Each structure stands twice: as structure tokens, then as C-alpha cells.
């Protein structure tokens, strides 16, 4: 399986088309990010291992398949990544949630890390690292660096976004060729300000109604 995947499910693509529209309200944008995050989680969790478990139905005992107890952590890159967390938790409510806080220096376009808060057993968990946008790749690279410094295993890290620029994908793959990348769309390019084109604007501002 390729370590880079565009998830082309019709429901995801339909909701993404509405999300991109500039007239989408903060409420609509927030709800759509939540919904697409949940749908992306369905695809990203496709390879979770299963085990046989014996249960009893109202009729008789039987053997069923359940996820094999693999621990999961959802780690949003703040602040926009928070918008994807609740949707994933709807599917996987037992997951732990960590946080990696970053902001982008608007002059250098480089990320600055200000917070890392992770489950103590992060080394033993499969990790969904989430951020709606993969633009230059700087924030994602720094976030994966932070996870690896805290003993997270590369094979357990999956970066999940809604929209990616080719430049960001290339940069993240170069820095961390050992992690998987999932996106709902691979867009055309970055503009001179480091924003994805056509993109969907500033995801954080649109999620939280700020400027």
C-alpha cells in the first residue's frame, strides 16, 4: 500500500466541495470538518487488526470479530486540527487525545511550537496526527519530529488532512518517508503567501470565526 493516499469516497468529495465555498458559514464549516474527519477516520482505520471474541447473543453463544485492543491516540495540530477530533471520536470513542500547539510565523512561513501534551504511553499507541491543511509541510514535519522524540513509532503514525499541496506532501515525505499520509484532496499548488490554491482559505479562522 502506498504511504500517500487521496481518499476519494463520494461522500467525502461532496462535503469537501461545500466546505471550500467562501460563503459557507462558521457553523457550516465546523460541521463539515467534523463530518469529513469522521469519514476520513473510516478509511484511515481500515487496517486496524481484528481478533475473535466469544459473546452471547439473545439466541446463543457465537464468535465475533472485534478490534484487537490496539491503543489509539488522536493528536491534532492546534488550532485547526481540533476541528477534526470530535468526528473521529464518534467512531472511536475510547481514543486518547493529545495536543501539539503551533502557529505559523507570517514572515518566515515557518512553524513555531508552543505546546506538546501527549498520553504517557504514546510509544505504544497508533497515532492519527490531524490537521485540515498540509500546506508547506512545516507544521506536520515539526509535529512528527515531536512525536518521534517522545518515542512514538513511525509505523504507527498516520498524518490525516483534508486538503494538501504538492509542495507539502513532498516536504513531509522527504523529512519522514516512514509515515503514512491521507488527504481528501491534492490541490494545485501554494501561492506566494504559502496558502493552498484553490484550497479553502484559513481553516483555523473559518472554524472559529476569527480573522
Curated annotation (Swiss-Prot):
It catalyses: UMP + diphosphate = 5-phospho-alpha-D-ribose 1-diphosphate + uracil. It is an enzyme of class 2 (transferase). Its EC number is 2.4.2.9. CDD domains: PRTases_typeI. Keywords: Allosteric enzyme, Glycosyltransferase, GTP-binding, Magnesium, Nucleotide-binding, Transferase. One of its GO terms (biological process) is UMP salvage. Binds 1 Mg(2+) ion per subunit. The magnesium is bound as Mg-PRPP. Allosterically activated by GTP. InterPro entries: PRibTrfase_dom (IPR000836), PRTase-like (IPR029057), Upp_B (IPR034332), UPRTase/APRTase (IPR050054), Ura_phspho_trans (IPR005765). Uracil binds at residues 196, 201-203. Pfam families: UPRTase. 5-phospho-alpha-D-ribose 1-diphosphate binds at residues 79, 104, 131-139, 202. GO terms for molecular function: GTP binding; magnesium ion binding; uracil phosphoribosyltransferase activity. Pathway: Pyrimidine metabolism; UMP biosynthesis via salvage pathway; UMP from uracil: step 1/1. Its cofactor is Mg(2+). Belongs to the UPRTase family. Catalyzes the conversion of uracil and 5-phospho-alpha-D-ribose 1-diphosphate (PRPP) to UMP and diphosphate. NCBIfam families: PRK00129.1, upp. This is Uracil phosphoribosyltransferase. It comes from Lactococcus lactis subsp. lactis (strain IL1403). The gene is upp.
Amino acid at each position: 500500500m502506498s504511504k500517500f493516499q487521496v481518499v476519494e469516497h463520494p461522500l467525502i468529495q461532496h462535503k469537501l466541495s461545500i466546505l471550500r465555498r467562501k460563503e459557507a458559514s462558521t457553523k457550516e464549516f465546523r460541521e463539515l470538518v467534523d463530518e469529513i474527519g469522521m469519514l476520513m477516520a473510516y478509511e484511515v482505520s481500515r487496517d486496524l487488526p481484528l481478533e475473535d471474541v466469544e459473546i452471547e447473543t439473545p439466541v446463543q453463544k457465537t464468535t465475533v470479530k472485534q478490534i484487537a485492543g490496539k491503543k489509539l491516540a488522536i493528536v491534532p495540530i492546534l488550532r485547526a486540527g481540533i476541528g477534526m477530533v470530535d468526528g473521529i471520536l464518534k467512531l472511536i470513542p475510547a481514543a486518547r487525545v493529545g495536543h501539539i500547539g503551533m502557529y505559523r510565523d507570517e514572515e518566515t512561513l515557518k512553524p513555531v511550537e508552543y505546546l506538546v501534551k501527549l498520553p504517557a504511553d504514546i510509544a505504544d499507541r497508533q497515532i492519527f496526527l490531524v490537521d485540515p491543511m498540509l500546506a508547506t509541510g512545516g507544521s506536520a514535519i515539526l509535529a512528527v519530529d515531536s512525536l518521534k522524540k517522545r518515542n512514538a513509532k513511525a509505523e504507527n503514525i498516520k498524518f490525516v488532512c483534508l486538503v494538501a499541496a504538492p509542495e507539502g506532501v513532498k516536504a513531509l515525505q522527504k523529512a519522514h518517508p516512514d509515515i503514512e499520509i491521507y488527504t481528501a484532496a491534492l490541490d494545485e499548488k501554494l501561492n506566494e503567501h504559502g496558502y493552498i490554491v484553490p484550497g479553502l482559505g484559513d481553516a483555523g479562522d473559518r472554524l472559529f470565526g476569527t480573522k
